[in-house]
Structure formats: C-alpha cells, structure tokens
C-alpha cells in the first residue's frame, strides 16, 4: 500500500497495526510478527523478481496465484494474473477463480510453490534479503487474524497472550524461515 494515496483513516489504522506488530515483536526474544503489506515478509509487499521461465512478478502473491492457476492448467487465469502489474488483491481474486481447483491438491503443493516464490523474491532483492537475514533465528509469524493456514489466526496484539499450541499453521512464516536458511546456505557456499 502507498501511504500517500491512502485515505487518512486507513493510514491511521495501518500505522497502528504496524506499531502493534513492532511492539509485539519487541516484547518477544523468540518471535518476529508481521502482517502489514508494508512488511517485506508480506506476500503483498512490492518486490520485482523473475522466475526460471523469465516471467516478471511484482510481488510473491502474484507468483503464488500464477502458479496455482498453472497447477490446475487454467492458462487463461494464469495469463490474467501475469498481466496484472501492481495490485496483489487482483491476483488473489483471480486465483480464487481458478477452474478445476482441487483444494487437497492445492494444499499439497502450496508451500512448495510459495517457498520458491519467496526464495526468488528475497534472493533477487538485496535490501529485502538483508531484512530477512537480519531476523537471525527468530520465528517469523504472520499475525493474520483471519488466516489459520498461512498465518496464526491471531493479530500480533493477541498472539503473545494465547498459548502457541492454539495458533494456526503459520505456513507463510515457515516458508520464509526455510528461504532464510536456503539463502544463508547459498551465501556460505559463495564465500567458499
């Protein structure tokens, strides 16, 4: 989201949300909470990168939805998603319209697909890569109150007040931490 074009009330809500995430992360020596699209860890955060076929993506949400459409051989929706140039929500909406979707197959493949997109995003953007590596060994937590699969099902303001065993799956946090380890390993190999 571009703060300069956002209505004043929406800007205030986003600033409060980011402050809450920062406060919750600061209160923990174990977790780093994120959710806002201004966070580099969000799939909606703008970050250009190219996949193995030379396709240009403007965010990892676009990559995810494009590959979701390809998984189910919906080339029309895939092209629609790839043609989007700046709005991750439009990609998400198009991804929900994928024909022949089998949710079990999607759930079996989603983490691998998103993991590859996240790796490309961070490995091709040095400033984002530095931010990911700066999280050291903290557990990255998507504090999405309405998502118990990719997030934990709680906002950052509530996350530390409930037992972690009742958190959602946090798949996005997991793929980010896997990407962090993969990038560290690649960097170590380059130094040798």
Predicted segments — roles?
Residues 3, 7-192:
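Charged, low-complexity intrinsically disordered segments
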């Amino acid at each position: 989201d571009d703060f300069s074009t956002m209505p004043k009330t929406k800007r205030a809500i986003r600033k409060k949300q980011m402050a809450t995430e920062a406060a919750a992360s600061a209160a923990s020596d174990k977790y780093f909470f994120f959710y806002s699209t201004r966070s580099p860890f969000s799939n909606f955060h703008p970050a250009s990168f190219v996949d193995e076929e030379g396709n240009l993506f403007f965010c990892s949400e676009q990559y995810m939805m494009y590959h979701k459409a390809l998984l189910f051989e919906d080339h029309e929706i895939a092209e629609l998603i790839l043609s989007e140039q700046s709005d991750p929500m439009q990609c998400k909406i198009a991804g929900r319209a994928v024909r022949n979707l089998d949710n079990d197959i999607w759930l079996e493949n989603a983490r691998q697909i998103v993991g590859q997109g996240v790796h490309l995003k961070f490995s091709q953007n040095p400033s984002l890569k530095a931010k990911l590596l700066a999280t050291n060994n903290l557990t990255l937590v998507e504090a999405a109150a309405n998502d118990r699969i990719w997030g934990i099902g709680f906002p950052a303001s509530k996350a530390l007040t409930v037992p972690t065993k009742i958190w959602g799956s946090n798949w996005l946090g997991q793929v980010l931490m896997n990407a962090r380890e993969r990038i560290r390993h690649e960097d170590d190999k380059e130094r040798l």
